[in-house]
Amino acid sequence: MRAAYLLAAWISLAAWAPAVRASARPAPQAQILDGIVARIENDIITLSELRELGAYQQLLDGHSQSDGELRSELIEQWIVNNEASTTRFPSPAEAEVDREVIRIQSTFPNAAAYQQRLTTVGLNAEALRRVVGRQIYLARYVDYKFRSSIQVDDAAIADYYRNHLVPELQAKGQQAPPLEGLTDQIREVLVEQAVSNRSSAWFDETKSRLKITLEPMDGLPSGTRASQP
């Protein structure tokens, strides 16, 4: 979940705005033992979960993280879901999941191309909705946990504009719009950066207190290894 895969719903600031997304793991329930890639306290992370997350990343980006990165991602998702479910954080409405699925489908040229891509990466409609629902749940909880305590002042906004945005746009041969028209967008970027930094620190601190065992993944069955970036 590091600044890599939070649901891409925060902000879209041209090519220079950072985007992060992630997906929360559902509450523990009866599972078919298909292979264990990690043990956390009295729970497990399965190979099918790793495969599903990798397939989702391939659907969106054309590639996925490595197996080790996917496992790390799932461990952090477990941490978020464990706390969120303990506090009875509300699940997203079906209509919200519908909207995000429709948005994903709209990135493909037509319905046939979308269905073909789902088949290629190994996802069906039900699995996609499950992953999307987890994404929304996770992103919302992380935002809820950290956003309210983050303050961004005008000096920080001006500094970002002057020392980051303007040089990046100039390097691309583009002229930066006036700061006045970008204040709210830059503020959101800085808030999201702070949320990402605080969540990363939270993951590191929480993992140091958990009993986590990483299982060998060198012998994963054929066809289950996630594709590399």
Write out the residue ranges for each language-model feature.
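Bacterial N-terminal signal peptides
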Residues: A4-A15
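A short N-terminal beta->alpha junction/helix N-cap motif
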Residues: I40-E41, D61-G62, R88
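Mature N-terminal segment immediately following signal peptide/propeptide cleavage
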Residues: A30-A55
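Short, surface-exposed, low-complexity cationic segments
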Residues: R51-Q65
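N-terminal signal peptide c-region/cleavage motif recognized by signal peptidases
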Residues: A17-A19
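Peptidyl-prolyl cis-trans isomerase
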Residues: A22-P28, I32, Q65-P229
